[in-house]
């Protein structure tokens, strides 16, 4: 815990407090600078021409009219891409996976509607857009594969020449003897779950600026990315530029949710274009481009077979997962499919399990990271199966869950391909039911049903993969680099402190939380700590950047270690000056004092001046300067967990769903900033509700997007989001210094299953139809009511 590291003096003053986010004032006042606000001298604007077809051969491209338009500086097409340019790399590779080479601009074949085929540099965006209309492209349309079923058809079209099928990779995991478990069980049943295609949809779209120096040797990039170091590495590899000559800066991000955790084709394209025109070039993605070119997510079909005994104990599970990667394996598209496959036992002690997952390609934009990665899909399938099991056995779904949890005494516990480090699932379960008022809700439900009202109660329990990730584990599973984090901390001559981290702040408040950690270690106010992010020239290398609930679990301990080392150096100087026993010294009031004699005090400013300027005043064994570096690389993943409980009312005439109660009880370990944590949970639950009820990227059989704007791609607003209740059970992580477990994806994972379980529970008196496809829209609810008479 924090107090142990700091020997109890000022430590714990700030960690655990709701310190207001320091960035909010600038954002609310319109002073915050995003990438669209950056203007460089002589900067040109870029616009991309994108394929209108989902699958076609490029016969010819004529750019002559576009080049003749006043204000146009250049038009670049696939044929202009130099031969030395390499395909975009992957962050994770999987055994026997097939390559899907991706060029900055399509050269011969386009594989999704929205794939870039040309890019224009012009004096402004208006001229660039006008020039796009003057580019003449002749296409030869090819057969389209627009769904998982079509992709897996034996005699269907292949997206890549020479492939025997459309499968990029296949992964599998197995424990126990599934066949024997199925043969000896009292009950065996199976279901198919269809999870829709989603879009992270951050408020700020992507943006990118490339600027070469006057010699054309050094590259400056401003990129709205969550992964500045990986962006530099990828750019170096793709364009054959030494990484030392590339500087990546990520300004303030208006959200990411995983969408900005990828390296996109537009990025090297803009760099090449800027070199051709010998001027800075900026590209700001418009909303239509965001829907058709920024990564999609979630789409899977999961077939589950489960066996159990009559008392509700689950003895085996088999899962067959098919994930739609879109047109290519993009940065880490396979990752969510793999994670779904290894999470198919959930939080339950299921001794026999088999999971097989296929990642397939279709003529849709690439898919990839979105808050929760593959966990919401796995949780939805498993938690829906538990509810259906309870219904078949006429048991309470809460009771069925409780007898199946991995007990605390079995921790650490290894499931399909992961090890839970710890967990008090039964304790949290009991606490959640009591706090939610489960028994009272059951009584209220019975009374409402007697009046013909359709009230339903739903629940789900999840464990979240966090502290991503152990470097050796990542390398073992095919990651191109480790998941450690490095932090550098410096105190200047005034006593102010600067923390440098490779993490990025995309609205989640990480700079606040890191400042609180550093402030506690040094006896400062968080306002005295400036956290510097988003610049490869200033910030240390970090293994994975911001995402996967790793900022506080990996970045936090790195800052803690750096601050503790700086603290030790400060104390060694102060001890020399104050001639005091080290155990009597306290860091407080921007200095060091003797605990029982506060008049004996030396300021940080005095220590800073000595460390940097008056070196003669330092102890002989102390080097000049006040800087320290901290590195943290966990040996194992951390596992926060929680239980979602929801009460809804369904209007059986309209299919409308109203929330009556919405609660999450969770254990994320030590809470650094409760206000920020609650904000993370609010947003995560909202996105979970969106997946359950609203959002869907719908494609027709020709691979054309029918929901390419916020008018059609529905997202819940403040009017649709219910009031939420949270309860925090704190059990410190045994692996992470400080005890943190992570929270960034927690609200998202279990919400869809809880909401759909509640809706189905409400409809049980009038229909036997099952709601196994999301989103559960009003028309699907009405169809379920009309299709299934209650037995």
Curated annotation (Swiss-Prot):
Keyword check for Metal-binding: yes
Biophysicochemical property: temperature dependence: The caffeine dehydrogenase activity increases linearly from 25 to at least 66 degrees Celsius. An incubation of 30 minutes at 70 degrees Celsius drastically reduces the enzyme activity to 11% of the initial value, and 77% of the activity remains after 30 minutes of incubation at 42 degrees Celsius.
Activity's dependence on pH: Optimum pH is 7.0.
Listed cofactors: Mo-molybdopterin cytosine dinucleotide
Gene3D superfamilies: Aldehyde oxidase/xanthine dehydrogenase, a/b hammerhead (3.90.1170.50), Aldehyde oxidase/xanthine dehydrogenase, molybdopterin binding domain (3.30.365.10)
UniProt EC number: 1.17.5.2
Residues annotated as binding Mo-molybdopterin cytosine dinucleotide: 257, 371, 548
Pfam family, one: MoCoBD_1
InterPro entries: Ald_Oxase/Xan_DH_a/b, Ald_Oxase/Xan_DH_a/b_sf, Ald_Oxase/xanthine_DH-like, AldOxase/xan_DH_MoCoBD1, AldOxase/xan_DH_MoCoBD2, AldOxase/xan_DH_Mopterin-bd_sf
Enzymatic reactions: caffeine + a ubiquinone + H2O = 1,3,7-trimethylurate + a ubiquinol; ubiquinone-0 + caffeine + H2O = ubiquinol-0 + 1,3,7-trimethylurate; theobromine + a ubiquinone + H2O = 3,7-dimethylurate + a ubiquinol
GO molecular function: caffeine oxidase activity; iron ion binding; oxidoreductase activity
UniProtKB keywords: Metal-binding, Molybdenum, NAD, Oxidoreductase
Origin superkingdom: Bacteria
Annotated cofactor note: Binds 1 Mo-molybdopterin cytosine dinucleotide (Mo-MCD) cofactor per subunit.
SUPFAM superfamilies per the UniProt record, alphabetical: CO dehydrogenase molybdoprotein N-domain-like, Molybdenum cofactor-binding domain
Family membership: Belongs to the xanthine dehydrogenase family.
Subunit structure: Heterotrimer composed of an alpha (CdhA), a beta (CdhB) and a gamma (CdhC) subunit.
Role this protein plays: Coenzyme Q0 (ubiquinone-0) is the preferred electron acceptor and, to a lesser extent, coenzyme Q2 (ubiquinone-2) can also be used, but oxygen and NAD(P)(+) cannot. Is involved in a caffeine degradation pathway that allows Pseudomonas sp. strain CBB1 to grow on caffeine as the sole carbon and nitrogen source.
Protein name: Caffeine dehydrogenase subunit alpha
Taxonomic source organism: Pseudomonas sp. (strain CBB1)
Lineage of producing organism: Bacteria, Pseudomonadati, Pseudomonadota, Gammaproteobacteria, Pseudomonadales
Gene: cdhA
